[in-house]
Amino acid sequence: ETRYEKFLRQHVDYPRTAAPDTRTYCNQMMQRRGMTSPVCKFTNTFVHASAASITTICGPGGAPAGGNLRDSTASFALTTCRLQGGSQRPPCNYNGGTSTQRIRIACDGGLPVHYDRAI
């Protein structure tokens, strides 16, 4: 798995997978995308946009933010999943929140390889 492929697996869900609520969405998606074993990842953000549109941040759709980080000029629909309780041992139970924000990512060779944060 390349760094780009890992970015896609962990952070891109487009179109957004249907779920009755954000809690169910997060519990399903975190498990489905391999972020609940061997330990539960504390927090993770899914971007509901195409890989192509996110990749533009590495070029004309983004501005330098220091090092290999770039800030998107556009806003994206996001779902952020946060682990409930202190234990990182499965079963993992997540709560989720949705927002529309600009994002900061790291690029390598013109491709997104790391999600830094919403800005």
Swiss-Prot record:
Record's function text: Endonuclease that catalyzes the cleavage of RNA on the 3' side of pyrimidine nucleotides. Acts on single-stranded and double-stranded RNA.
Keyword presence, Translocase: no
Organism: Chelonia mydas
Keywords of the record: Disulfide bond, Endonuclease, Hydrolase, Lyase, Nuclease, Secreted
Protein name, as recorded: Ribonuclease
Residues binding substrate, per UniProt: 6, 9, 41-45, 82
Enzyme Commission no: 4.6.1.18
Cysteine pairings via disulfide bonds: 26-81, 40-92, 58-107
